[in-house]
UniProtKB/Swiss-Prot annotation:
The gene is 32. Binds preferentially to single-stranded DNA and therefore, destabilizes double-stranded DNA. It is involved in DNA replication, repair and recombination. Binds ss-DNA as the replication fork advances and stimulates the replisome processivity and accuracy. Interacts with the polymerase and the uvsX and uvsY proteins. This is Single-stranded DNA-binding protein. Homodimer in the absence of DNA, monomer when binding DNA. Keywords: DNA damage, DNA recombination, DNA repair, DNA replication, DNA-binding, Metal-binding, Zinc, Zinc-finger.
Length: 49
């Protein structure tokens, strides 16, 4: 089983990943779009890449 050598090393890796701006952005409006029909019912197409 996997055992961590150092929690400080893990924390440094997490901090490095948290600063990554190339990942998922919640501001991306292209992930899903809501469409309304004439009755006001909504449909959404969710795309996972």
């Amino acid at each position: 089983m996997f055992k961590r050598k150092s929690t400080a090393e893990l924390a440094a890796q997490m901090a490095k990943l948290a600063g990554n701006k190339g990942g998922f952005s919640s501001e991306d409006k292209g992930e899903w779009k809501l469409k309304l029909d004439n009755a006001g019912n909504g449909q959404a197409v969710i795309r996972f890449l």
